[in-house]
Amino acid sequence: MGKTGKSNKNRLQVRRVVDVPLREVSGICLRRGRNGQMFLIAVGDRVAKIAWFSQPRSDGGRIDWHTSNIAKLSGSMLPKRDSQIEAVCADGLGRVLLLQETPPRVELIDPKALKVVASIDLAVEGRGEIAQAWSDPKGSRGEGAVLLPGGHLLVAKEKKPATLN
């Protein structure tokens, strides 16, 4: 029991703190390698850099970070600085998708081939509220993303209005 007499079992407990080799972290995800090994991937929106490590077998296991400059990958259109990468997710083949808020687009990276295999501009068509908000240069766009079956992508728009597209 805690000082207030309430149980601590429903409280978040920090098990480990790990420094990330990025200036800031805007997105994280898990990626399964071909042999089943799990990797944690982190991105930030200050520079076009990705950081990852292979998950250790135990909570206290050693973490060896690796980093790569995404802007140097073949086919990447990301600027080296102020890349505006807001989210990262991985598909079942181990490819990594990066969501860029400004300009609104995604890049799908094949980590084995060290190249961008697809770059897609994100546009909301029409004249409705969402389309107008999405095209506003001062507005908010994609802040989170999830890959869905059938090659679909779900994008979370942060605010004004907050939506799932």
What are these regions (language model features)?
Residues 1-165:
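Sequence/structural signature of beta-propeller domains
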